[in-house]
Design a protein with these regions (language model features):
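Helicase P-loop NTPase motor core
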Residues: 43-46, 51-145, 168-173, 242
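Conserved helicase NTPase motor core
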Residues: 1-37, 52-56, 254
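Short alpha-helix plus adjacent loop in nuclease-associated cores
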Residues: 21-26, 55-56, 148-171, 183
Length: 352
């Protein structure tokens, strides 16, 4: 801001385009005061308010005006359009996220069956990626094709795959793929060479990888990997003794004792916070199931629909990703305190 003031001090030749009602790049250092207080710095400014909207219906604009009018210190501005009034906004008060997802899928199916819209006409917005889990499950169960824009499908996310691999490694000792996935997650000093030695031992002795892992001292493992393998085998042994605790508790225990959650907490980044939210969502989704087998069977059923050329798909994305896009039918989920807006923004009016 100071650089602009110095450059324009003599000729006052500054042209600025902005929106005084939003500051979506505050996390990158943008300051909304540069817009709100611009006329103080340049009293001779000519202001042109662009308040005609060419995309939305008046119903949507009225709702937006109603919300945005509560902004502190804003410049008065009412959006309008010459388009038709449009459909009314529908508010559905759901009991929880399961009820919410069921209602959305029901509405989408109803409108699609009536021939009034294609799958690609529908978009579902959420604040955090973790919220997509229940939506993906319900869409897959209803055989509705979908895509996740600007992100990865819930069960394809790295941390979710890691957590499920721990669970599968405990429940199924012969699941070599899952064991190898988490053998060095978090890092235990077990590299590819150590895994190769275990593979060679298993092949030479005609045993499974899990059995080779249990006999790692005989496989010629050396260096830091010795401690890492000892800790891992001890962890899997402890978790196996608690397999009857149920999937939710076993997941929580595995992630805590392995140090996985601690590593994410110590990272203190937005990405790590998102991964923690995804893991919390996964653990919560496992609570209704009594056994790990039942839960893992349900997870295996939530698989992506077959890809087809030019296939029409329902779109799932965060609100941030959705900026500038248009859809005939939009659902916004999780409109509740602590989620929308985030609980981290509630104490700061500027964040709201």
């Amino acid at each position: 801001n100071e650089i602009v003031l110095k450059l324009a001090d003599e000729h006052r030749n500054v042209f600025v385009v902005g929106d005084s009602d939003q500051s979506v790049y505050a996390f990158r250092g943008a300051d909304i005061r540069n817009i709100l207080e611009f006329e103080k710095a340049f009293p001779d400014t000519s202001v042109v308010i662009l308040n005609q909207n060419y995309r939305s219906t008046q119903v949507i604009l009225d709702a937006a005006n109603s919300v945005i009018s509560n902004n502190f210190g804003r410049k008065p501005k009412d959006l309008w359009t010459d388009k038709t009034t449009g459909e009314k906004i529908v508010l559905y008060r759901a009991d929880d996220e399961v009820d919410e997802a069921a209602w959305i899928i029901g509405e989408v199916q109803r409108l699609h069956q009536h021939g009034t819209l294609r799958w690609s006409d529908v978009a579902i917005f959420y604040r955090a990626n973790a919220q997509s889990r229940i939506l993906e499950e319900r869409l897959a169960s209803a055989s509705i094709p979908y895509r996740v824009v600007g992100g990865t499908r819930f069960y394809d996310r790295r941390e979710v795959k890691d957590a499920l691999a721990y669970l599968r490694a405990v429940v199924n000792p012969s699941d070599e793929v899952s064991i190898k996935r988490v053998l060095n997650v978090p890092k235990r000093g077990v590299g590819d060479s150590s895994v190769a030695r275990l593979d060679q031992y298993a092949l030479a002795h005609g045993v499974s990888f899990r059995e080779a892992l249990a006999n790692w001292p005989e496989a010629g493992i050396s260096g830091p990997a010795k401690k890492g393998l000892a800790n891992f085998t001890e962890l899997i042994g402890q978790l196996s003794q608690r397999a009857s605790d149920g999937p939710a508790e076993l997941l929580q225990t595995a992630l805590e004792r392995s140090g996985y959650l601690e590593e994410l907490r110590d990272e203190r980044s937005i990405e790590a916070e998102g991964r923690l939210e995804n893991l919390a969502e996964l653990i919560g989704s496992a609570e209704p199931f009594e056994t790990c087998d039942e839960f893992l069977e349900q997870v295996s059923l939530v698989s992506p629909t077959d890809d087809l050329d030019d296939q029409s798909e329902v779109t799932l994305m965060t609100l941030h990703t959705a900026k500038g896009l248009e859809f005939p039918l939009v659902f916004i989920v999780g409109m509740e305190d602590g989620i929308f807006p985030s609980f981290m923004s509630l104490g700061d009016p500027d964040q709201l």
